Amino acid sequence: MRITIPPKNQGNALVFTLLTVLVIGMALASYLALASSQNVTTMRSLAWTHALTVVEAGVEEALTQIHYNGITNLAANSWNYISPGLYYKKRSLGNGTYCEVVIKPVEPPVILSSGFVPAPMTPSTQLGMILGGVLPGAAADQEIALIKRKVRVNTKRSPWYTKAMLAKGQIDLKGFNVGTDSFDSLDPLYNTLGKYDPAKNKANGDVATNSELVDSLNAGNAKIRGKVSTGPEGTVDVGPGGSVGDKGWVDTGSRGIQPGHVDDDMNVDFPEVVLPEGTPGSVTAGTYSIGGTNYNYVLSGSAAGPRYLQTPSLGGKVYVTGNVALLVSASFSFTGNDCIYLAPGATLTLYVGAPSATLGGNGVINSGSALDFQYLGLNTNTKLAFGGNGAFVGAIYAPYADFQLNGGGNNITDFIGASVTSTVQMNGHFNFHYDEALGRRGPQRDYVVTAWNELVPDSWDEL
């Protein structure tokens, strides 16, 4: 009789279980390795991007230093002079992150900024396969690798007056025979004896707004020899008789906007007006007879530099000699036969804090250029009414003021210069002639970035 011994399935089950665990373990290890690799890649990408924000912080640090100290006092605020003629600062931003910044004090200044961010851990590092990041206590016993990025930034000053008309908000050019063009009072090819000459005009009479609204710029039937610009998604409306373009387009009667003469990328800063340093002298109203005309105010300056004066109110007839800077704090009104007369060679810079100002009457009698008269509105100056029939030669910078133009002149020289305001509302006859010399000789904004180039972050010799 043959006895059958049953197989021992327990051993087979154990082997099968071990093999299964091994396969699952290998799969899990492969998955964890893949997850770790992806995590490290993601963390490195985030660190790489973060390093650029640290670089930007360094650039802002440098621009702020230049804003307050120019390029002649860069040793202020704990900046260190290093050879050859450079200024350096290191700024810690926490968690092992920091930036190093160097300024080269030339005109315009050049900035080098480097950003340093702790690198994420690699899979070979303790717990790196799972964490993918820097361990809190790693710095105590090992040097943490850093991700470094570095840029060279070129700068330049941006002029206040770059357009015939510039506004933060809406521009509405209603009226009759409204037009813009440009000339250059410092280039004899584009002026006659320094004055506007329609036979020598140019087509840079640009009109622009930061507004992003529909109908941000209503050109109406204006003849704009230049370009029109709005903020992102803003629109320009041109009436049936309106024309925007170069001289060939506008002067030949073409209607609408010439291709290439409209864009929607306008985004400029409007810095506040800063008063001159020092204590202003006082101004006394009275009756002053000069050349057979009685004046209410006589403002006498010096030839060397502006004399800083102050008055709570200004109006009537004003006579200006020399270079004068005048603060008008409460009331500014010129109507009827009122005027501001600039003697030959005189300059006047008005700092107007009056909430509502009127510049009408016979306007500003300025035999010089637009560089000789500036109206600067403080943040309390929220309205400026411009009218009368006198020609205006000068520049208006009132970034908080709603600019209302009523009436208009009786010839082609209504407004020579440039305007920068909050909004523009036009009614009447006005021709704007932008003096391009204002862009070169007029006031300048702070330095702005013009070029941004990423470099190898191991030396400062790219300056």
Label every model-predicted segment.
Residues 2-170, 444-463:
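Beta-strand/loop motifs with alternating small/hydrophobic and polar/acidic residues, enriched
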Residues 148, 154-463:
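Primarily marks folded extracellular/lumenal domains of secretory and cell-surface proteins
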